[in-house]
UniProtKB/Swiss-Prot annotation:
A cellular-component GO term for this protein: cytosol
Name of the coding gene: proB
EC number annotated for this UniProt entry: 2.7.2.11
Pfam families: AA_kinase (PF00696), PUA (PF01472)
Name listed for the protein in its UniProt record: Glutamate 5-kinase
Organism of derivation: Prochlorococcus marinus (strain MIT 9211)
Length: 364
């Protein structure tokens, strides 16, 4: 049995002259039904609510205003789920809708609840359809066509494989639409190779922002948790069927042989640091070399404002990020305490090692 997360991009659900949106979704549902009959489990992370909403509302152009996009998404999401429900029902399966925002993952309890809900639905043989809650998410919460969301879902439920279905056949060394020198990349074998590829995606083109760049981020999040990732051309009906039967996508990102684990992945990727804590050299060495917790005595300076139990970055005197974790004290409390000589003795723990992840453990 293989647990799959399948991310279907917006561009794939718009429909073409040859294939309507309904036919496209029917094809995907057919592939999934065949795979489920073999004993596999699946979660779909589906974009497309805004686009379908615009079609339902008769808009000629996609709105630019965030409120218009949210309203269009609320219309489109209903239609999107109707299609998935209709076609999976023809194969004898039920579907469930899961709408998520970034704030849902920032709470460890909500993160666990989402994971348990998804696992229970899978146990019942239901196909969960996950989407970002576009109707209420604001600009700071948008995941980027659900690429990052699909990786976070994959790590939350310990998926075996993540398939990123998109409108390109594979990863290239540069944008093949603008360069004749673009070379296909069929395998990304290790974190250093992935890091090198990410560093080359710099220019603000469709290839570099919100397109392939977010897919590379998703691949990094998933592979460092031990999940195999396929980047594949979802425009071809046979692509998904072949992958679910054991073939490979156009580009395969191979999983880390030393996964960081669910909790560390959550700390590193599901949370947005609210501030930063600058630590001294002794604390740097203790945390990096000995796996120690951060004590109050090792703090030099506080950057930004945060409350107790919020995520923060740990940085050295040069501003380089060393780790991320959950601070047990607020920035105000820390600011009042770090210069108090009485705290040098029996120094309290500010970030326990159980809620701290080293940057060196990640592919960043």
């Amino acid at each position: 049995m293989t647990l799959w997360v399948l991310k279907i991009g917006t561009s794939l659900l718009r429909g073409t002259e040859k294939l309507s949106t309904k036919k496209i979704i029917h094809n995907y549902c057919s592939c999934i039904a065949e795979s489920k009959a073999r004993g596999d489990q699946h979660i779909i992370v589906s974009s497309g609510a805004v686009g379908l909403g615009c079609i339902q509302l008769g808009f000629k152009d996609r709105p630019n205003n965030i409120n218009d996009l949210q309203a269009a998404a609320s219309v489109g999401q209903v239609h999107l789920m109707d299609l998935y429900q209709e076609y999976m029902a023809t194969f004898g399966y039920k579907v469930a809708q899961i709408l998520i925002t970034r704030s849902d993952f920032s709470s460890r309890n909500c993160y666990r609840n989402a994971s348990m809900t998804l696992k229970r639905l899978l146990d019942w043989g239901v196909l969960p359809i996950v989407n970002e809650n576009d109707a209420i998410a604001n600009e700071e919460l948008l995941y980027g066509d659900n690429d990052t969301l699909s990786a976070l879902v994959s790590t939350a439920i310990n998926a075996d494989q993540l398939v990123l279905l998109t409108d390109i056949d594979r990863l290239y060394s540069t944008d093949p639409k603008v360069s004749n020198e673009a070379k296909p990349i069929t395998d990304v074998l290790n974190p250093n190779q992935l890091k090198d590829i990410e560093s080359t995606i710099q220019k603000p083109t469709n290839w570099g922002t919100g397109g392939i760049k977010t897919k590379l981020v998703a691949a990094r999040i998933a592979t460092e948790s031990g999940i195999k990732v396929h980047l594949a051309d979802g425009r071809k009906p046979e692509t998904l069927s072949n992958i679910l039967q054991g073939s490979r996508g156009g580009t395969v990102f191979h999983p880390s042989p030393k996964p960081i684990g669910n909790r560390k992945s959550w700390l590193a990727h599901a949370l947005d640091p609210a501030g930063a804590i600058e630590v001294d050299e002794g604390a740097c060495k203790a945390i990096q070399n000995n796996g120690a917790s951060l004590l109050l005595v090792g703090i030099r300076q506080i950057h930004g404002e945060f409350t107790a139990n919020q995520p923060v970055k740990l940085i050295n005197s040069k501003g380089k990020e060393l780790a991320r974790g959950i601070s047990s004290l607020s920035s105000d409390s820390l600011g009042n305490s770090i210069n108090n000589p009485t705290n040098n003795k029996n120094s309290p723990v500010v970030i326990h090692r159980d809620v701290l992840v080293l940057t060196s453990d990640l592919f960043t």
